């Protein structure tokens, strides 16, 4: 008898068919797109700006280079990279979610950030770019929402130039137990209430909190990047390990 069971994955704490997750995540981000920047500031007390600034500082991006801001959303990193690469460089803001991509495009154009930025709707698991194309790739608070993380990392490796680097900024595992307990209390009790009050959507922010807990910890993600082909993989814990920045190179 042929096994008819479907492959499964997690959507927050729920187990769902792999083929369903992409659509379910899409609905979350369609729902939160309009209030995404405001909620980021409220949820992190503005600290997400420091985490992103650190990521840019670690990128090594220079004038004339080509950068992929994957899962770039509303374009915080793209705006910074646009200034660094200058007129001769290029930044591609890619996101699988049409609503997030539209918000990012409108936000950056309103700020006058045009000319060296383009926008592509793309799935991280099958990036529509040539081999050895980018000098630097960043994915900020996006990898945990990808169904096949290993496949996405291999796709990023393929389109990165030799000598290029990948930076993964993502929520991770707090280093100290007291911080972990306080973080859990905030994430599961306060965060959904903020989502309900500000975005009229407690459920999406409950999923976001759950997705953080299901994401690989620092050492596991380091190993996954190495398995995908990246070398000299390291990470920096930020805010006590609530967030980590992983770096890997293609040689």
Curated annotation (Swiss-Prot):
Pathway named in the protein's UniProt entry: Quinol/quinone metabolism; menaquinone biosynthesis; menaquinol from 1,4-dihydroxy-2-naphthoate: step 2/2; Cofactor biosynthesis; ubiquinone biosynthesis
**SUPFAM superfamilies given in the database record:** S-adenosyl-L-methionine-dependent methyltransferases (SSF53335)
Give the EC class as a word.
transferase
The UniProt annotation places S-adenosyl-L-methionine binding at 74, 95, 123-124, 140
What does it catalyze? a 2-demethylmenaquinol + S-adenosyl-L-methionine = a menaquinol + S-adenosyl-L-homocysteine + H(+); a 2-methoxy-6-(all-trans-polyprenyl)benzene-1,4-diol + S-adenosyl-L-methionine = a 5-methoxy-2-methyl-3-(all-trans-polyprenyl)benzene-1,4-diol + S-adenosyl-L-homocysteine + H(+)
Q: GO BP, one example?
A: menaquinone biosynthetic process
State its Enzyme Commission number(s). 2.1.1.163, 2.1.1.201
Keyword Membrane set for record: no
Q: Name one Pfam family in it.
A: Ubie_methyltran
Q: Tell me the keywords, alphabetical order.
A: Menaquinone biosynthesis, Methyltransferase, S-adenosyl-L-methionine, Transferase, Ubiquinone biosynthesis
Any GO MF annotation of the entry:
demethylmenaquinone methyltransferase activity
- Going by the entry's taxonomy, the superkingdom of the source organism is recorded as Bacteria
Q: Which NCBIfam families match?
A: MenG_MenH_UbiE, PRK00216.1-1, PRK00216.1-3, PRK00216.1-5
Family per UniProt?
Belongs to the class I-like SAM-binding methyltransferase superfamily. MenG/UbiE family.
> What does the UniProt function comment say about this protein?
Methyltransferase required for the conversion of demethylmenaquinol (DMKH2) to menaquinol (MKH2) and the conversion of 2-polyprenyl-6-methoxy-1,4-benzoquinol (DDMQH2) to 2-polyprenyl-3-methyl-6-methoxy-1,4-benzoquinol (DMQH2).
Name of the protein this chain belongs to: Ubiquinone/menaquinone biosynthesis C-methyltransferase UbiE
């Amino acid at each position: 008898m042929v096994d008819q069971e479907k492959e499964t994955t997690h959507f927050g704490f729920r187990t769902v068919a792999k083929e369903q997750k992409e659509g379910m995540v899409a609905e979350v981000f369609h729902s939160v797109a309009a209030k995404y920047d405001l909620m980021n500031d409220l949820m992190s007390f503005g600290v997400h700006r420091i985490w992103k600034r650190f990521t840019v500082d670690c990128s090594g991006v220079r004038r004339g280079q080509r950068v992929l801001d994957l899962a770039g959303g509303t374009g915080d990193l793209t705006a910074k990279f646009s200034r660094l690469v200058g007129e001769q460089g290029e930044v591609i803001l890619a996101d699988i979610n049409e609503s997030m991509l539209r918000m990012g495009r409108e936000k950056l154009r309103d700020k006058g950030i045009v000319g060296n930025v383009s926008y592509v709707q793309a799935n991280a698991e099958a990036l529509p770019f040539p081999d050895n194309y980018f000098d630097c790739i960043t994915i900020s608070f996006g990898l945990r929402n990808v169904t096949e993380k290993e496949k996405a990392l291999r796709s990023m490796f393929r389109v990165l130039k030799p000598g290029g680097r990948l930076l993964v900024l993502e929520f991770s595992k707090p280093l100290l137990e007291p911080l972990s307990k306080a973080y859990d209390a905030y994430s599961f009790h306060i965060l959904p209430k903020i989502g309900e009050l500000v975005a009229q959507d407690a459920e999406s922010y409950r999923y976001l909190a759950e997705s953080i807990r299901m994401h690989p910890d620092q050492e596991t993600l380091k190993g996954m990047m190495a398995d995908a082909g990246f070398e000299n993989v390291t990470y920096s814990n930020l805010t006590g390990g609530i967030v980590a920045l992983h770096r890997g190179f293609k040689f």
